[in-house]
Amino acid sequence: MTFYQELQLNQKGSKELIKNSQTTKEKLYHIAVYLFKIAITVAFCFLFVTLFSILFGSENSIAGVVVLLCIMVFRQAHFEIHAGQSTVLLALFFINMTVCSHLANKLPPVVGMLVNIAALALLVFLGCHNPSMFNQSTLVLGYLLLYGYDVSGKSYLMRLAGMAVGAVLTCIVFYRNHKHRTYDKHVIHLLQEFDLSSTRTKWQLCQIICVPVVICIAELCAMPRAMWAGIAAMSVILPLMDDMQYRVRKRIVGNIAGVICFTVLYFLLPSPIYAFIGVIGGIGVGFSTQYS
């Protein structure tokens, strides 16, 4: 395996390579490659979002995060339909995330909830056909981030420009990596497979309805950044009940541990370092092999 090929491994693959090393020298080499991969990934993400913020305004840095997330995910993930139609869908998803998230913010909570339901229906029914691909963790999350960090006026015009550039970049990367894949399905087949008796359709409807309802309730209760409640709901809604119950139990423990860690860092670190707590978290994610 070449150095470049080893850099392409995910965390699990890298850790298995380290674990199966035959000699100490070989293990140290694989550890060094693994650490280097994490370092350049974090550095690339930081530089990408920084450049996006410079070009389109600091208030649109979250849009840079969404674009970066889409590029990194959809260079490998796909929609299991014709590559050309998938690329068009991806562009449509960017329009949906940018326009509908802004529109919902301008409306009362209950009416905004209906807009969110319609927007998520498009994303989930057409973009999250295979739950094992976890496309909802990209598309729905991206929508909710833009919804929670909405902008207006000139800043929104800059967001439109930034997301348009992001859509072009993502579509180019996506089509380049997936144009040789062969799928018999087309968009119409995704709609035809809607079946209220299937586990997948029930899961999709749960995502589409429950997430906006949770956000609406949080907004009616005057909670700040209500979209985080929606993200929490989205992340635990899984197709199988046993998996959902397992994740909820893990999430309770994880949230408590996360709050404690953040509080400790907040009081131990000097205030100039606060802005880098997210980067520290990103490095921690780089060492993770699974998501619970």
Annotated model-derived regions:
Residues 1-137, 141-292:
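Alpha-helical transmembrane segments and their membrane-interface boundaries
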